[in-house]
Amino acid sequence: MLTLSAAAVSGACSEQEYEDLTKPEKVTGNTQYAPYTIDWTEAADSCSTAFIERFYCSENRNGYEGVFSYREYNATGSANSNNYWQQAHAMAAMVEYYNRIKATDAEEKARIEGYFQKWYDKRGNNYEGNQNWRGSTGFGNDFTDDTCWIIIALFQMYDATGNQTYYDAAKQTWDECVWPRHELTQSGWLPWKWSDLGPNECTNGPAAIAAATLAQYSRAAGNEEAAQEYIDQACTCFDQNIDVMASDGTLGSTPLSYTQGTCMEAGRLIWKLTGDTGY
């Protein structure tokens, strides 16, 4: 494919021009990203505010309010009906913005906190109709991995705001809706979902992160017994990743940045908790 591409382009420009286009000069030190000085704080804030304006439904947009949308301004409406795990990653971006401005812009801080609360009240756009799977918090879902991402988002909201409600919801959702599912599998690993009990790395990676985070909170609160329980849960989930890991470190038959990344972070967290350098 590379040979064909080169041949095709060479008809439109010289070989040297093609080389210049495909192999730009590498700049070391203060990397030059633009022909002008970039204010990175301003750039980050600009991207964040544009993202929130376009993808967070601060008002009713085609029937959705207080949640994030697939499309800008929720132009497609009904397509947002099963938009759940994506909410967690969008929320992570909003939390990062909030962390940057909360000490310097009281008005903006209050606005974003209001968005957090709206999102929480809407249970992060959880579309799950089975009340048993939703659990008492309303954040549980058929998909275990989706629920884990929402739990992680709630932890991030708690860390940023100190609002105990977010922590309590995350912990209860894990204890009630996620961890009990390990009893449904012979291996003791978490299943992909209630309706498909096969464990996989896209579930057990973020699950290990969630459990390790709970262990951190428990240890910080002086509850070492609870910390050890959550460490054991994190290690159990991590074992699933180890089980499918090839000798070169790739996970599963199709390595993904998603699963490789969650495995790496889970291992780092467990190492910090246990001191076991094997992780």
Residue ranges of predicted features:
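Aromatic- and glycine-enriched pocket-lining scaffold segments that form the walls
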Residues: 164-236
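Bacterial N-terminal signal peptides
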Residues: 1-8
